[in-house]
Amino acid sequence: MRFDKLTTKFQQALADAQSLAARNDHPYIEPVHVLAALLGDPDSGAASLLARAGVAVNRVQPAIDSALKGLPQVQGEDNVQVGRELQSVLVRTDKEAARRGDTYIASELFLLALADDKGDAGRILREAGLQKKALEAAIDAVRGGENVSGAEGESNREALSKYTLDLTERARQGKLDPVIGRDDEIRRTIQILQRRTKNNPVLIGEPGVGKTAIVEGLAQRIVNDEVPETLRGKRVLSLDLAALLAGAKFRGEFEERLKAVLKELAQDDGQNIVFIDELHTMVGAGKAEGAMDAGNMLKPALARGELHCIGATTLDEYRKYIEKDAALERRFQKVLVGEPDVESTIAILRGLQERYELHHGVEITDPAIVAAAELSHRYITDRFLPDKAIDLIDEAGARIRMEIDSKPEVMDRLDRRIIQLKIEREAVKKETDDASMRRLAVIEEELEKLQREYNDYEEIWKAEKAAVQGTQAIKEEIDRVRAEMAELQRKGQFDKLAELQYGKLPELEARLKAADSAEREAGESDSGKPRLLRTQVGAEEIAEVVSRATGIPVAKMMQGERDKLLRMEDFLHKRVVGQDEAVRLVSDAIRRSRAGLADPSRPYGSFLFLGPTGVGKTELTRALADFLFDSEEHMIRIDMSEFMEKHSVARLIGAPPGYVGYEEGGYLTEAVRRKPYSVILLDEVEKAHPDVFNVLLQVLDDGRLTDGQGRTVDFRNTVIVMTSNLGSQHIQSMAGKPYEVIKEVVWDELKHTFRPEFLNRIDEVVVFHGLEAQHIESIARIQLKRLGERLEKQEMRLDVSDAALAEIARSGFDPVFGARPLKRAIQQQIENPVAKLILEGVFGPRDVVPVDWQDGKFVFTRTLQ
């Protein structure tokens, strides 16, 4: 026996047999041990070979187990030896290998030798239906006329079943999603596949446009015989490159596996079409020093037409990997897959609707489908249809399913309250005074009431949940019946098809209708309480998912938000004093956008705020961010004085390729990509270099900007505010004149500084008035209120008299510098003295800090609160 000439698989089987004998205290390794080891290894292929030869494999394993129990056992024997019976079988195996001309002895010849064996192993196989001729035929079929010439000869067998996934089989089983539309691309793919040479289409398109779906659509058409005669009966196999590479430890193993795949494909005489998803991964796959990569190994087969291949890759990766290898590129024919429009996406979603309803066990309404297509197109700009729309449907369905599976919020709230009261009851029980006794009676009464309410809700919830689960089970049964009907139609078994179509299916549909109505009835209790479980995905659920993902308020406005928008001016006036026109113009722009009337291809609003320093230009922008997002954090503030040089424009949008900082992205573009719904403040805009305005033209007109890395950043959900001091001398000199007259003069000044195409794209040029004495007093109140809030954190209260307020306003008023001197006046005249008094211990927690103006100075007299 040539033990050095056993294949790796056979050597492994003998080693496993030795371990099995040692574990069971058997002194000798018998053929039955080796048979058990071969059948126990899922990678050996012995079980599939015996099944192909007509052996009932499920009967073999129990018989082996009982045979092993019948073998003699010797306790404490470590040296396990090869039994005489096994030696005899191995010799016959060696002879059979020599007769067949094999260099290495494969494990299937051991099974062939067992066919003549008189021992347990041979008897077990014969009783399970083994016939020598059938096994020989099965071995010849598996080998495909090849001899075993290497130690890995067995590993590379049936390479297609190991390293590919049969898409046509999955289509036959109904496991692929239906493919709606894409007829032109599928037709073009079929057309290329029918060519004599270079019959290899490559599907090129952006991620998520449906390249893989086109191949799945082709597999479904082949299964349904909706293809030309030349493609009928062919299989579409998806190549699993990861499986090809996994475990290829030694040099040449990967190449051997790929050669085995190519050889099987060549033997099948064009009956298989290989689909390579992410085709660019083939370039460089398995590459080692001096070795060929997968791409180069495929070239000869592709050129000769032996390999029918469909590739799929994105535009960027095609350009980066495939186009660089001209020899590989010319062997493929390009099929460009574009992004479908919103109407096509809606059709695709309607086709997938049933699958997602079945998976999540919820109902997806048509408004939800339309909303998913439209909202994803409008608000999710960095991804592509239909993928991003499908994601919205999927996530909304998952959210509703999660609500169904978990306890409803109203019950959860009651449950927590009941637990809280029970804890309180146990604490009160320990007390003996009258007040505690009365409290205990109140707790008992409330507990009883809450428990009754909870039990009512629980009953409704269980009824609703049972109804939902019943509906789901019927839907799954209908889906299974439809898949069975499709299979029967393909096989032409019309008698059984008619049985299902006119018997079982109508019965199931009637049951579903009854279950649906029962579910609706379960939703309304006797007391008229609303449904506890939502089972429908509507447009609002889709809008909620979009809002959560992007931070953009897409969901339908609640009444509270409507009222808030209508009173927006009041909110802004709390922080900005004396600028009525500016506040009104900004409020109108926000209301237009939230009511859905604004141009969807431009930012919500673009404003140029003009006016002297310290009149509230920046403060209004802060107030706007606070109003929209309840936080000033959503304001992206860019000081344009930092962009005075020509080269600093690159900082806004990111450095071009080849420059330092290319990977970091742009200051403005990255901020908007992270917060697509925000207020952008470009402060002191006239100080920026003129080239900066060229960048802003695209933002103001189309609501988009391309950064240094070629990505399009969406500005359509932003409010852009630019501030400038231009024309401030005219505004101050014309104080008291009508707003329109002042604006006209300032507009003439603007024309000398900014280009017409820039000014023309701004929605509103807002002129801020210089502040007057009465405005300063209101601003002083606002600033002192903020100081009061800071003191309240230290448990102190600020009390400013009218005389003190008037003096602060008087000393802080400067018509040239606006409200900023007021801040300095408060700091010097109030904050500094109060800080000293707090440190000296004059004022402490629970004190009132009074501020008064007496005898030409500020007085702080301590009183208890």
Curated annotation (Swiss-Prot):
Family that this chain belongs to: Belongs to the ClpA/ClpB family.
Repeat 2 as annotated region, ranges: 82-145
Function: Part of a stress-induced multi-chaperone system, it is involved in the recovery of the cell from heat-induced damage, in cooperation with DnaK, DnaJ and GrpE. Acts before DnaK, in the processing of protein aggregates. Protein binding stimulates the ATPase activity; ATP hydrolysis unfolds the denatured protein aggregates, which probably helps expose new hydrophobic binding sites on the surface of ClpB-bound aggregates, contributing to the solubilization and refolding of denatured protein aggregates by DnaK.
Keywords noted in UniProt: ATP-binding, Chaperone, Coiled coil, Cytoplasm, Nucleotide-binding, Repeat, Stress response
PROSITE patterns, per the entry: CLP_R, CLPAB_1, CLPAB_2
Protein name as it appears in the record: Chaperone protein ClpB
Cellular component, GO annotation: cytoplasm
The Clp R domain, residue ranges: 3-145
Subunit composition and interactions: Homohexamer. The oligomerization is ATP-dependent.
Molecular function, one GO term: ATP binding
Region (C-terminal): 771-865
Free-text note on domains in this protein's UniProt record: The Clp repeat (R) domain probably functions as a substrate-discriminating domain, recruiting aggregated proteins to the ClpB hexamer and/or stabilizing bound proteins. The NBD2 domain is responsible for oligomerization, whereas the NBD1 domain stabilizes the hexamer probably in an ATP-dependent manner. The movement of the coiled-coil domain is essential for ClpB ability to rescue proteins from an aggregated state, probably by pulling apart large aggregated proteins, which are bound between the coiled-coils motifs of adjacent ClpB subunits in the functional hexamer.
Subcellular location, record wording: Cytoplasm
UniProt entry tagged with the keyword Ribosomal protein: no
Binding residues for ATP 1: 205-212
Region feature (NBD1): 158-339
Predominant subcellular localization, coarse grouping: cytoplasm
InterPro entries reported for this sequence: AAA+_ATPase, ATPase_AAA_core, Chaperonin_ClpB, Clp_ATPase_C, Clp_N_dom_sf, Clp_R_dom, ClpA/B, ClpA/B_CS1
Endoplasmic reticulum in keyword set: no
Region of interest: Linker: 340-551
Annotated GO biological process: cellular response to heat; protein refolding
Top-level taxon: Bacteria
Residues where ATP 2 binds: 611-618
